[in-house]
């Protein structure tokens, strides 16, 4: 009997695939079975094309169903109304969700009927699976809380996102201002983690009251490392020697630099594994983060190298020695993007009155937690308390690639007692901050506003690269603030209490103090 039930299910699925609605399908209304989307499209006169923008939404949906318009191409077919294209795509999604829900209910009903036949001994064909009506389910309404209006989608197409159905509003807070290199700077942070902005603000306040933070840019250069294959390791070694010849490097650099006004090749590091060769190109990129710019230059450079090594196979433009969006020792040791150090001296009075702890406690905890603890965990570039928290919040606010927080959050936090143990010296060293003030999401209105807040939107025409360098300095200073504040909270035992205040819904009563464990409600990175 179980076999019969299984056959019943298979036949139902077969019928569903044929017609979209199984012959076993029963609902409160069968009007949907008579609907044919293509019936709402007027017959197109011969020799005359239809302007899609003149059609009604349902007529456009019918063309999608017929395969004449691809859902991801709605914006190109509605070039004067991208917002309408997004609305139509939402309707398509809601309808598809409705259909899938109906199919799921039908499958459940078929299984229930088969099980009933198996246990009762009845003839399976005499049992009609009954599916409850789904007309009361509003899948389009379920998208109501995903905003769609009041957004300029012309800035998204071909740049930021595909198959757009709306956008996500994220709260943006401001920390500071912090006195950075002699100027007051406010720090925009987009986050959903309560206490993060407040904590960073406290750190910025302590730094500013103590005379401010200073930064130094150690190096700047985006990297891309294609992987190539030679016939043998001997030829791979010869390629390495060829590239390391200064005259040959200049020839490759000339080809690389010809692809952009801003790209200037600085170095090529050659890494060999057997007969595989990884060529890590490093280039300046102006005010752009520069991944696309460097990739374009690499393609041109490889053409020159191939002239001298025609047997070389380029397996991939990226061979993971770059390294992008993945933890790696090479970024930690040699840098990628901007390498920045931010430092400050915090007076003992500020440590006591603002941070509510002591210099001795901070220095000791930093060694035990950020240095020894991270070493015991085998961390690569993670010798800090929560650098990625601040990096990600700043990246989202300013239109950076949030996924690059992986390498951009590489950071070692150091603390020392100075002036006879009276004051605190703190620094963060961040070798791979990947940022830009042009390209990516930096041109979106909200993100542009945050860059305006920092006075670094767009390209710096007087000194190309200056704006992106300043953004990297701001990132480092913000991380310095966040590290100082969180480490102080941990040293003073305030972490749980601060999160209970800032990281809970206001309508929810706070738990009694004696029921809170010390591990409850810790931040995502502590």
UniProtKB/Swiss-Prot annotation:
What family classification does the UniProt entry report for this protein? Belongs to the HMG-CoA reductase family.
Note the InterPro entries from the entry.
HMG_CoA_Rdtase, HMG_CoA_Rdtase_cat_sf, HMG_CoA_Rdtase_CS, HMG_CoA_Rdtase_eu_arc, HMG_CoA_Rdtase_N, HMG_CoA_Rdtase_NAD(P)-bd_sf, HMG_CoA_Rdtase_sub-bd_dom_sf
Q: Where is this region: Disordered?
A: 503-526
* Catalytic residue list: 193, 325, 401, 499
Could you tell me what this protein is called?
3-hydroxy-3-methylglutaryl-coenzyme A reductase 2
Quote the gene name from the UniProt entry: hmgB
Q: What the protein does?
A: This transmembrane glycoprotein is involved in the control of cholesterol biosynthesis. It is the rate-limiting enzyme of the sterol biosynthesis.
BP-aspect Gene Ontology terms: cholesterol biosynthetic process; coenzyme A metabolic process; isoprenoid biosynthetic process; sterol biosynthetic process
- Sequence ranges of Polar residues compositional bias: 514-526
Transmembrane stretches, by residue range?
Answer: none
The reaction(s) annotated as catalysed by this protein in its Swiss-Prot or TrEMBL entry are:
(R)-mevalonate + 2 NADP(+) + CoA = (3S)-3-hydroxy-3-methylglutaryl-CoA + 2 NADPH + 2 H(+)
Q: Kindly list the GO CC terms recorded for this protein.
A: endoplasmic reticulum membrane; peroxisomal membrane
Q: Which Pfam families match?
A: HMG-CoA_red
What's in the keyword line of the UniProt record? Answer: Cholesterol biosynthesis, Cholesterol metabolism, Lipid biosynthesis, Lipid metabolism, NADP, Oxidoreductase, Steroid biosynthesis, Steroid metabolism, Sterol biosynthesis, Sterol metabolism
Q: MF terms per GO, please?
A: hydroxymethylglutaryl-CoA reductase (NADPH) activity
**Enzyme Commission code(s) on record:** 1.1.1.34
Under which pathway is this protein filed?
Metabolic intermediate biosynthesis; (R)-mevalonate biosynthesis; (R)-mevalonate from acetyl-CoA: step 3/3
Organism field: Dictyostelium discoideum
């Amino acid at each position: 009997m179980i076999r019969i039930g299984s056959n019943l299910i298979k036949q139902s699925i077969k019928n569903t695939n044929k017609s979209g609605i199984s012959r076993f399908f029963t609902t409160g209304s069968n009007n949907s079975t008579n609907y044919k989307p293509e019936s709402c499209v007027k017959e197109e006169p011969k020799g005359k094309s239809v302007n899609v923008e003149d059609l009604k939404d349902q007529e456009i949906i019918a063309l999608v169903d017929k395969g004449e318009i691809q859902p991801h191409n709605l914006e190109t077919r509605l070039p004067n109304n991208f917002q309408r294209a997004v609305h139509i795509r939402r309707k398509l999604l809601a309808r598809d969700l409705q259909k899938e829900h109906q199919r799921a209910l039908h499958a459940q009903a078929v299984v229930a009927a088969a099980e009933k036949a198996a246990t009762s001994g009845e003839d399976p064909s005499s049992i009609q699976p009954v599916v409850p009506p789904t007309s009361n389910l509003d899948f389009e309404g379920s998208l109501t809380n995903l905003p769609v209006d009041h957004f300029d989608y012309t800035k998204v197409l071909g740049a930021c996102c595909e198959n757009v159905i709306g956008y996500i509003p994220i709260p943006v807070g401001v920390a500071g201002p912090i006195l950075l290199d002699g100027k007051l700077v406010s720090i925009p942070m987009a986050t959903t983690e309560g206490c993060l902005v407040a904590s960073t603000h406290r750190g910025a306040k302590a730094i500013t009251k103590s005379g401010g933070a200073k930064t130094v840019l150690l190096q700047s250069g985006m990297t891309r490392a294609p992987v190539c294959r030679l016939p043998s390791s001997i030829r791979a070694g010869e390629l390495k020697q060829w590239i390391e010849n200064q005259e040959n490097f200049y020839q490759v650099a000339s080809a690389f630099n010809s692809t952009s006004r801003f790209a200037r090749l600085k170095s090529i590091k050659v890494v060999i594994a057997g007969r595989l060769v990884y060529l890590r190109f490093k280039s300046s990129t102006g005010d752009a983060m520069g991944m696309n710019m460097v990739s374009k230059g690499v393609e041109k450079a490889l053409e020159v190298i191939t002239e001298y090594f025609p047997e070389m196979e380029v397996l991939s433009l990226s061979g993971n020695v770059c390294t992008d969006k993945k933890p790696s020792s090479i970024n930690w040791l040699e840098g990628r993007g901007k390498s920045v150090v931010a430092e400050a001296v915090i007076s003992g009075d500020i440590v006591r009155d603002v941070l509510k702890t002591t210099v001795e406690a901070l220095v000791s905890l930093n060694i035990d937690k950020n240095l020894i603890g991270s070493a015991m965990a085998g961390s690569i570039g993670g010798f800090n308390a929560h650098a990625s928290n601040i990096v990600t919040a700043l990246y989202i606010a300013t239109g950076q690639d949030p996924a690059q927080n992986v390498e951009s959050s590489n950071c070692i936090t150091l603390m020392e007692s100075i002036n006879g143990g009276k004051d605190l010296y703190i620094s963060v060293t961040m070798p791979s901050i990947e940022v830009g003030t042009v390209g990516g999401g930096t041109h979106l209105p909200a993100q542009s506003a945050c860059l305006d807040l920092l006075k670094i939107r767009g390209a710096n025409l007087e000194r190309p690269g200056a704006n992106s360098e300043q953004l990297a300095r701001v990132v480092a200073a913000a991380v310095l603030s966040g590290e100082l504040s969180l480490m102080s909270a941990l040293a003073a035992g305030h972490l749980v209490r601060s999160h209970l205040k800032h990281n809970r819904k206001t309508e929810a009563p706070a738990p009694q103090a004696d029921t809170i464990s010390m591990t409850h409600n810790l931040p995502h990175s502590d």
